[in-house]
Regions:
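Conserved lysine of the Walker
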Residues: 301
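Conserved NTP phosphate-binding and transfer environment spanning the P-loop NTPase/kinase superfamily
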Residues: 286, 409-553
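Short beta-strand-centered segment that lines the nucleotide-binding/catalytic pocket of NTP-utilizing
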Residues: 314-332
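Auxiliary tRNA-acceptor-end handling modules of aminoacyl-tRNA synthetases
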Residues: 53-56, 60-72, 86, 95-273, ...
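Hydrophobic positions on the alpha1 helix immediately C-terminal to the Walker A/P-loop
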Residues: 304, 308
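Ubiquitin-like/PB1-type beta-grasp interaction modules and other compact soluble beta-rich domains
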Residues: 1-102, 113-114, 126-130
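Conserved nucleotide-sensing/catalytic segment adjacent to the nucleotide-binding pocket
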Residues: 333-376
Length: 553
């Protein structure tokens, strides 16, 4: 008698019986579900798996398409695989580094012992399309980890071998197209023909690989230059090469050798040096009356603001800190989003008229009374706090909209200095697996929300898509307006954050939507060796999230 298992599908609320060992692709065909952009993967008991994943027990399943974060990541990883194979086919002695997300794509470094030309890019793009058109199966293999480590070591891929040693797993999954094999952190598509849209062009000395838009997957987002952000990434990479930490495997080797404290000290010194340089530049421009700091959630804006203020004092200036949170309009006047909820992320939730009036009055030497927003009742009130600028005073204003030109439209640009703060993670898992900068910030937010706001990891993960949507609309479009970009990410921070984040992520129940993201983050953190936080100074930006800061928030 043929043995069967029960599958409950969330997409159509149906339950069916399938043969033991059926793949997710088999199940999808039996269910006869229609999806415009998929499926590309599925949640199996709220863990994301590829469509070639086999089922041996009763499962709850939800198929995902390109409009989901997991689906988009699956598609992107598959594109990385096809790109790496195409480069290998054309330049067998080359190596590829999938580097950083930038300009609505991913920057890719290719070493072919000379600078990459436009003709090279054309050849690579054509070879990628040939691989896609050939409809090559993408095979999934699961082998003992020791075997995978030997295989990648023999290929000369020591970064991948180091990473797999760090994971501590008994078995490792790797993928194969034709005779080319690679390892990816996460599942892939099952056939190269499922890639239907991509872009590839020359970008600086490397390539820019472009992927479909998450919300409208049949469109490639327009490439926008992000020269300032790119320069910060490359500067960080140069420093990492000096200290010998490019990948997680490199990092773990240093930690195991007892070098964790040195990494902390050097990273902290580098950040202080960068903040000092920004303060020096502000002090050198005598017309500056307003310093504006903006950045996405959990980028460390507040601590950056405090440390920058200290450095401004060291330059003979007298900073006056103002929070844009006190300039919210009354709740009943606040604009609403597409779901009918109050949209506090909107710039129009702020009293723009009052901001410009008060700032200009301060610059004229007049006294103003600052507002105070009561978040409990949603009303703006006079604070009783009066402010008047004296000689050498400079306003330091922090908030998500600080770089938006509309915020201070009536203040001359010559009086403004704009600082963009973000956590731009530059360490790689290995050459073909980058670490999303959003993961770094989400982990910061999870531990901060739990420690200071009484919000558990499940709720923080649940709110994150809404936060990201607001950032994409109100923050990221203005980051290139910055006069200075400050990278708040620390080379060692994931090794410290994991110790507080892992227990919180483990508390997310398996039967909730947020479990898949919590599981993904836990799986990612297992690659990283921990470092105790006792050597992190009280003025560290990370203390804003970890606790133990000497600053008052």
């Amino acid at each position: 008698m043929k043995q069967e298992i029960q599958i409950r599908c969330k997409n159509n609320k149906k339950s069916i019986y399938v043969a033991i060992g059926s793949t997710l692709s088999d199940v999808f065909k039996q269910l006869n579900i229609k999806m415009a952009y998929g499926p590309v993967c599925a949640k199996v008991n709220n863990k994301v798996e590829g469509m070639n994943f086999r089922l041996y027990h009763n499962k709850d399943i939800e198929f995902l398409d390109m409009t989901s974060g997991s689906g988009s990541r699956n598609y992107t990883r598959t594109l990385f695989f096809i790109l790496c194979k195409a480069v290998h086919d054309l330049f067998p002695r080359s190596y590829v580094v999938i580097d950083i997300p930038v300009s609505n794509g991913y920057y890719v470094d290719i070493n072919i012992e000379r600078e990459v030309t436009i003709d090279d890019v054309t050849q690579i793009r054509q070879r990628m399309q040939e691989i896609i058109d050939a409809a090559m199966p993408i095979k999934r293999h699961e082998v003992p980890t020791e075997e995978a480590i030997r295989m990648f070591s023999q290929k000369g891929d020591e970064a991948k071998a180091k990473l797999l040693k760090s994971a501590g797993s008994l078995y490792t999954t790797y993928y194969q197209i034709d005779d080319y094999v690679d390892y990816y952190y996460g599942s892939l598509l099952t056939n190269t023909s499922q890639i239907y849209l991509f872009g590839l062009e020359k970008y600086y000395v490397g390539l820019l690989l472009r992927i479909p838009d998450l919300k409208t997957p049949d469109i490639l987002p327009e490439m926008t230059r992000q020269d300032k952000m790119f320069s910060i990434f490359k500067e960080q990479h140069q420093w990492q090469n000096i200290v010998g930490v490019r990948t997680v495997g490199d990092f773990n080797e240093i930690v195991e050798a007892g070098g964790g404290t040195d990494l902390i000290n050097v990273s902290e010194a580098l950040q202080e040096k960068k903040i000092s340089r920004i303060a020096d530049e502000i002090a050198s421009r005598k017309d500056i009356k307003l310093v504006l700091l903006a950045g996405p959630s959990s980028s460390g804006k507040t601590t950056t603001c405090k440390r920058l203020s200290i450095q401004l004092v060291a330059n003979g200036l007298k900073p006056l800190q103002i929070s844009l949170d006190d300039y919210f309009i009354n709740r009943d006047q606040t604009p609403r989003d597409e779901n009918g909820e109050y949209d506090y992320e909107s710039i129009y939730a702020l009293n723009l008229k009052l901001i410009n009036e008060q700032f200009r009055a301060l610059f004229r030497g007049e006294e103003v009374e600052l507002p105070k927003y009561d978040f409990q009742i949603g009303v703006s009130k006079p604070s009783g706090k009066k402010l008047k600028m004296q000689e050498n005073n400079v306003l330091v204003v922090e908030g998500i909209h600080a770089l938006n030109p509309e915020l201070t439209a009536h203040i001359p640009d010559r009086q403004k200095f704009r600082v963009y703060v973000s956590a731009l993670t530059t360490i790689l898992l290995d050459d073909h697996n980058y670490i999303p900068t959003t993961d770094n910030r989400l982990l910061r937010r999870i531990i901060r929300d739990y420690k200071y706001r009484g919000v558990d990891a499940r709720e923080s993960i649940h709110r994150w898509p809404s936060v990201r949507s607001g950032e994409n609309k109100w923050i990221f479009p203005f980051q290139e307006n910055a006069d200075a970009v400050f990278n708040s990410a620390m080379l060692f921070e994931l090794a410290v954050i994991k110790q507080q984040a892992e227990p919180l992520l483990e508390q997310v129940p398996e039967n909730c939507e947020e479990y898949s993201e919590a599981y993904r983050l836990r799986k990612f953190l297992k690659y990283i060796k921990p470092i105790p936080n006792k050597d992190i100074p009280p003025t560290s930006l990370l203390r804003e999230f970890l606790g133990g800061s000497s600053f008052r928030y």
